[in-house]
Amino acid sequence: MKSLQKGFTLIELMIVVAIIGILAAFAIPAYNDYIARTQVSEGVSLADGLKIRIADNLQDGDCVTKGDSSTGEVGNEDKGKYALATILGTPAQNLSELKAEDPNGCQVKIEYGKGTSGGSVSALINNTELVLAQLANGSYKKESSTVKDKFLPKALKENK
């Protein structure tokens, strides 16, 4: 009488493990890139939040204000989980004469790895920075970056 096979053979299990290993070899780097892109996007979102502060500062004639946190006055930086965004620059002369796509002289410097979480920043972007120049229409243009282009949002890649 023949006995019925119950379970899997060692070869079948080894094949399954090999297939999982091959899939993981492709999936893990792609996942790490995804994490880095997400964290870079957080920094760009912080810069978007600083647009209103820059506009307020420009009303006073400068890109940077002398904020005082003890009095509740808003400062020139915004800290997220993975990045720190800081307002820099000197306003261009004759702001009212600038075209919409001309830089207004104000910049936002985004430093990755200086956020509130410290060590949980992706190693692919840790200790890198992205400097965005604000245009007269309020949008941003990439001015300089040590962040690899593949991690930048599409709008910044197209707007070099």
Swiss-Prot record:
Q: Which residues carry this modification: N-methylphenylalanine?
A: F8
Maturation-removed propeptide residues: 1-7
Cellular location of this protein? Answer: Fimbrium; Membrane
Disulfide bridge map: C63-C106
Q: Which Pfam families match?
A: N_methyl (PF07963), Pilin (PF00114)
Transmembrane stretches, start-end? 8-28
Q: What's a single GO CC term here?
A: membrane
**InterPro entries reported in the protein's UniProt record:** N_methyl_site, Pilin, Pilin-like, T4P/T2SS_Core
Q: Which UniProt keywords apply?
A: Disulfide bond, Fimbrium, Membrane, Methylation, Transmembrane, Transmembrane helix
Task: Give the membrane topology.
Answer: Single-pass membrane protein
Query: What broad class describes the main subcellular location of this protein?
Result: other
Report any one BP term from Gene Ontology.
cell adhesion
- Keyword Transmembrane helix part of the UniProt annotation: yes
Question: What role does this protein play?
Answer: Major component of the type IV fimbriae that plays an essential role in twitching motility, natural transformation, and protease secretion.
The record describes its quaternary structure and partners as: The pili are polar flexible filaments of about 5.4 nanometers diameter and 2.5 micrometers average length; they consist of only a single polypeptide chain arranged in a helical configuration of five subunits per turn in the assembled pilus.
Q: Which family does it belong to?
A: Belongs to the N-Me-Phe pilin family.
Record's protein name: Type IV major fimbrial protein FimA
The record's gene field reads fimA
